[in-house]
A protein has these predicted regions:
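Glycine-rich phosphate/adenosyl-contacting loop at the front of the ribokinase-like
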Residues: 2-86, 91-95, 101-102, 276
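Conserved phosphate-binding/catalytic region of the ribokinase-like
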Residues: 2-10, 16-30, 194, 222-279
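Residues that scaffold the ATP/ADP-binding catalytic core of kinase and kinase-like folds
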Residues: 41, 133, 216-220, 267
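Short, hinge-like loop/turn segments at secondary-structure boundaries
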Residues: 48-50, 99-102, 125-129, 202-206, ...
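Conserved N-terminal subdomain of the carbohydrate kinase-like
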Residues: 50-54, 61, 76-161
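Conserved beta-alpha-beta core of the PfkB/ribokinase-like small-molecule kinase fold
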Residues: 159-242, 262-264
């Protein structure tokens, strides 16, 4: 079994090159509200069949959780970051706290709960495909009251980072607190939710999605205030100007649309800007 250092936090689009293109530089006070997980990964030649036991390589334990990954990225970029969330009173919780602190993240708003730390059980086969089962653990204790208890942290931040790995009600509560305080809300819609409440949509300053998720969000009925049609396409190319108009109709002023290895597309009002992948 191997434990791996802070540098092995996965890079999340929530603080990537596209978001930095919108915000300028990710500096000053940044708050991140959400999930912390220990990623337990085993590589194996193939996935087992139902009821089958097979051998794999050594277990690798990585610090993770989409929100924790965002916090580490922002910390390594020089921002003063405060993480708001929860871990268990166990070794995985210790690993996550230590990894955040090594990146310069303030963990004083991370609660230690009398439950297991959230974990992701990941199996990777020889082709690089994976299966993931997430046990929320302490992340399940992050609720609306968590956001309310830390409204001073959220309100003093220049930017609030959010994703959807904790309760949607808690995410909306944190977003509303930030919006009312003038804090910019960067919302990474991951794990993807095609339907978002009007209250959350109104609070989002920067939406982060991939191109397929964007199309799903812009389908009829995808949200309380959704535009009527998904982005029109011509010659198999996305009509980014049309996407921008439809996002504006939903009340979202800016978006970062990730395109895999091609780098993200940044939408700011009517401006459409391709951004080179961050090295």
């Amino acid at each position: 079994m191997r434990h791996v250092s802070v540098l092995h936090h996965r890079e999340e689009p929530g603080m990537g090159a596209g978001v930095r293109a919108v915000l300028g530089d990710v500096s000053g006070e940044v708050a991140v509200f959400g999930s912390l997980n220990a990623d337990l990964t085993v590589r194996t030649e193939r996935f087992p069949k139902p009821g089958e036991t097979i051998s794999g390589e050594d277990l690798v334990i990585l610090p993770g959780g989409k929100s924790a990954n965002q916090a580490v990225q922002a910390g390594l970029l020089g921002a003063h970051v405060r993480m708001i969330g929860a871990v268990g009173a166990d070794g995985h919780g210790d690993l996550l706290i230590e990894s955040l602190q090594r990146a310069g993240v303030d963990t004083s708003a991370v609660q230690r709960e009398d439950v297991a730390t959230g974990t992701a059980i990941i199996t990777v086969d020889s082709a690089g495909d994976n299966t993931i089962v997430v046990s929320p653990g302490a992340n399940g204790t992050v609720d609306v009251s968590t956001a309310q208890r830390h409204q001073d942290v959220i309100g003093k931040a220049r930017v609030l980072g959010l994703c959807m790995e904790v309760s949607p009600d808690a995410v909306e509560a944190a977003a509303r607190i930030a919006h009312d305080a003038g804090t910019r809300v960067v919302f990474n819609n991951s794990p993807f939710h095609p339907v978002l409440s009007a209250g959350l949509l109104e609070a989002i300053d920067v939406l982060v999605v991939n191109e397929h998720e964007l199309a799903d969000m812009l389908k009829p009925g995808a949200s309380d205030t959704a535009a009527e049609l998904e982005c029109e396409r011509a010659d198999d190319a996305t009509d980014w100007a049309d996407c921008a108009r439809r996002l504006a109709a939903m009340g979202i002023p800016s978006a970062v649309v990730t395109l895999g290895g091609r780098g993200p597309m940044v939408i700011e009002g009517e401006e459409i800007t391709p951004v080179d992948p961050f090295p």
